[in-house]
Amino acid sequence: MWGLKVLLLPVVSFALHPEEILDTQWELWKKTYSKQYNSKVDEISRRLIWEKNLKHISIHNLEASLGVHTYELAMNHLGDMTSEEVVQKMTGLKVPPSRSHSNDTLYIPDWEGRTPDSIDYRKKGYVTPVKNQGQCGSCWAFSSVGALEGQLKKKTGKLLNLSPQNLVDCVSENYGCGGGYMTNAFQYVQRNRGIDSEDAYPYVGQDESCMYNPTGKAAKCRGYREIPEGNEKALKRAVARVGPVSVAIDASLTSFQFYSKGVYYDENCSSDNVNHAVLAVGYGIQKGNKHWIIKNSWGESWGNKGYILMARNKNNACGIANLASFPKM
């Protein structure tokens, strides 16, 4: 009987004092992520969004416990933002209106030989720590830098943080914090004959004048290759043979915003309309579910320490193979 009472106490407490519990959770969340608001009205507005997100997370995880989903959600530092705000402030992929493919840039896989069933470039030392782009639409710069860092490690044996701010400020074909595209970044590094290190050109998360300095140059690029559009088999081959690959995805759903663990597959995730650039650093299988290992640029508080496992071979889920590319070094 005592065990039953212990089990019932949280339920009774929640039934009697739901607002007090929410108040406590809200204050704890604000403290955890150092949240401050300009006015009481602003805080009330943000709390309503937070409560709606918290409810969504709770319902999803209940469904996941019943086997409806292959992944779980968790509250994070984006809790007081709508999914629309996240896309507006924290993505930044801008695809050129006309993309010309040529034999010079198209990646033609060598289909001879098997690729490994799984690969994780984090374990091979090809991947730098997770970064946070902040509220600057510079995802394209972090994705590009991640692919360049992987190739630098492959060529020289040295893992080095390269400068996304160098790209934000200096790639004239892109729009800095207003968005951009990865192959434009690779072309810039090729034309510029280099990109600075993060130490030489630190990230500030806003548009500034181009301050590239050759004395801080840490890597070069001699071109790029684009994966055949929508071809996950070719993408797998590229990741296995080349290294980390820049990819674009649809990151517009609440389920993506609060991803925590498991293999992410949401049937509402668009395979046509992509809006966010990330980095594919490997692939594998978890509990029978094939996945890509994706490095995001929203800090370690997001996802699984900054990473997400995204469904692989599920009809190009979230458009992951639509705009994949990597630099040549």
UniProtKB/Swiss-Prot annotation:
| Coiled-coil intervals, chain numbering | none
Principal place where this protein is found? other
UniProt xrefs under PROSITE patterns = THIOL_PROTEASE_ASN, THIOL_PROTEASE_CYS, THIOL_PROTEASE_HIS
Residues carrying covalently attached carbohydrate according to the record: 103, 268
Write the Enzyme Commission number(s) for this entry.
Answer: 3.4.22.38
* The keyword NAD is annotated on this UniProt entry: no
Q: Which residues form the propeptide?
A: 16-114
Tissue-specific expression: Predominantly expressed in osteclasts (bones).
What are its GO biological-process terms?
bone resorption; collagen catabolic process; negative regulation of cartilage development; proteolysis involved in protein catabolic process; thyroid hormone generation
What job does the chain carry out?
Thiol protease involved in osteoclastic bone resorption and may participate partially in the disorder of bone remodeling. Displays potent endoprotease activity against fibrinogen at acid pH. May play an important role in extracellular matrix degradation. Involved in the release of thyroid hormone thyroxine (T4) by limited proteolysis of TG/thyroglobulin in the thyroid follicle lumen.
Classification via PANTHER family = CYSTEINE PROTEASE FAMILY C1-RELATED
UniProt-recorded name of the protein: Cathepsin K
Q: Which organism is it from?
A: Oryctolagus cuniculus (Rabbit)
